[in-house]
């Protein structure tokens, strides 16, 4: 069995390109040739890096603006669903999502007590053999110093390169480092931000996602039939590929 060499930074993709691959003839997808092709026979010739087979315990930091409301990692979506407890929570704490939505939560994430080096030392003492940082959740907010759009942790919130600082701390402690991305589902995941209350005094008043000034965060509105986990929207699929 061959063993693939481990690169200093590994991208652990939490999203898959299944839906995209079926339509590759429609997009510009310059995928570089690698050590194997997408067949079972090819994949059986490779195995995990030795260090990973021996690493029984690693730590993944699924951490971002979701820590402001402290109501789970899907808060950015559920605050736009009138039947959800997160909607009521948001209404009471920050106001109606037609004016105060996820875009207004992001700047509240300051990370003022975050000390990645101290945490990494603690993780290593706990027995961690590798560390993975989230790069972006379904909320389309990037945790690194991105040039792709303004919704990133250097331009907003903590004004720090979260992924970069995690990487430096992991490298200093001799831990292999990876990044997870969750953008594949973002386009349809965020479509509730384009809708409105169905009942009550603000029924049919659009949520803030309907404002085109924020489509670089919430995405443009999807076709009504586009409701799958992975969007059929070709523009989004190309954008996702380019970002990753």
Positions of the model-derived regions?
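N-terminal phosphate-binding caps/lids of nucleotide- and nucleic-acid-binding domains
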Residues: 20
């Amino acid at each position: 069995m061959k063993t693939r060499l481990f690169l200093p930074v590994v991208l652990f993709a939490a999203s898959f390109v299944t839906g995209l691959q079926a339509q590759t003839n429609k997009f510009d997808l310059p995928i570089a040739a690698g050590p194997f092709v997408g067949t079972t026979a090819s994949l059986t010739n490779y195995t995990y890096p030795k260090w990973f087979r021996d690493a029984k315990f690693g730590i993944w930091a699924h951490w971002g603006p979701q820590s402001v409301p402290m109501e789970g990692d899907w808060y950015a979506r559920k605050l736009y669903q009138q039947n959800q407890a997160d909607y009521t929570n948001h209404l009471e704490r920050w106001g109606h999502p037609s004016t105060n939505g996820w875009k207004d939560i992001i700047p509240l994430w300051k990370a003022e007590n975050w000390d990645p080096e101290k945490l990494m030392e603690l993780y290593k003492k706990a027995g961690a053999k590798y560390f993975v940082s989230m790069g972006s959740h379904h909320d389309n907010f990037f945790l690194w110093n991105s040039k792709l759009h303004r919704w990133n942790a250097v331009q907003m919130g903590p004004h720090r390169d979260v992924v970069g600082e995690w990487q430096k701390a992991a490298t200093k402690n001799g831990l292999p480092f990876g990044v997870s991305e969750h953008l594949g589902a973002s386009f349809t995941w965020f479509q509730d931000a384009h809708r409105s209350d169905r009942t009550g005094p603000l029924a049919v008043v659009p949520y803030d996602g309907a404002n085109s000034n924020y489509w670089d965060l919430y995405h443009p509105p999807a076709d009504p039939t586009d409701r799958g986990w992975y969007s059929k929207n070709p523009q989004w699929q190309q954008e996702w590929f380019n970002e990753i």
